[in-house]
Design a protein with these regions (language model features):
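A short beta-to-alpha transition loop/helix N-cap that caps and shapes the active-site region
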Residues: 24, 82-90, 117-119, 170
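Catalytic nucleophile serine of serine hydrolases
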Residues: 56
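Flexible "cap/lid" loop of the alpha/beta hydrolase fold
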Residues: 60-102
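The serine-hydrolase catalytic nucleophile loop
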Residues: 1-5
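Helix-loop "lid/cap" segments that line or gate small-molecule binding pockets
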Residues: 94-99, 107-120, 140-144
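Active-site loop/oxyanion-hole signature of alpha/beta-hydrolase fold enzymes
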Residues: 6, 15-53
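Alpha/beta-hydrolase active-site loop signature
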Residues: 19-23, 83, 195-196
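Conserved serine/cysteine hydrolase catalytic core
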Residues: 127-182, 187-190, 198-199
Length: 199
């Protein structure tokens, strides 16, 4: 997201923030549901017209905010957004494995599944420690997402770009396709040579 933000801020005002329980928003006692995350986002954007961009779990926040804010949201872009509440979503994803762990291991297990053990071990100890402490937020978010749909396609009226990487996991590709097929105004976009972490 940082690279994308740098490109966009040449011509647009860009607001990036750390979700509750992560990076500069740590520590946070929660809760970590999509609804609570949307409250945070709504507080940040105020009454401005916005385009919302959400990567992974952030896509659900963007879609839920679009449903809530209506015409204030000009458009949404999602990338490999998990649809964990759907019965076809696999129970063997990085997210599913993370929530089966203790809080202290959840974020590490999640990261190792995403970037591999070699890259994880190459991270500085400080960075690994920062990621591990985010386990409570990660478990809270993923458990909430598995329990119920955080938005309804009928409530989203803005255009949505539904992105996935050509090297992405099958369930992320299928999730992006589902969004593009079921949202009112949507387009499917494949990023060549990209995986879940995007370019």
């Amino acid at each position: 997201m940082a690279l994308l933000a740098r490109h966009l801020q040449v011509e647009h005002r860009v607001l990036r923030y750390d979700r509750r329980g992560y990076a500069r928003s740590w520590p946070h006692a929660g809760p970590f549901s999509v609804d609570d995350q949307v409250e945070d986002l709504v507080g940040l954007v105020g009454a401005r017209k916005v385009v919302l961009i959400g990567h992974s779990f952030g896509g659900n926040i963007a879609l839920s905010a679009a449903a809530r804010l209506g015409t204030q949201v000009i458009g949404v872009s999602t990338y490999e957004t998990p649809l964990s509440w759907m019965d076809w979503w696999p129970g063997t994803t990085a997210g599913a494995m993370a929530v089966a762990s203790s809080e202290s291991d959840a974020a590490e297990n999640f990261m190792v599944r995403l970037i591999g053990p070699k890259r994880w071990n190459e991270l500085p100890e400080r960075t690994r420690g920062e990621r591990r402490r985010e386990g409570a937020a990660l478990i809270g978010e993923l458990n909430a997402l598995r329990m119920k749909a955080p938005w309804s396609v009928e409530d989203i009226s803005c255009p949505v770009l539904c992105g996935y990487g050509s090297n992405g996991a099958k369930h992320h590709v299928e999730g992006a396709r589902w969004l593009a097929t079921n949202l009112k105004i949507a387009r499917l976009v494949e990023l060549s040579d990209a995986a879940h972490s995007a370019p």
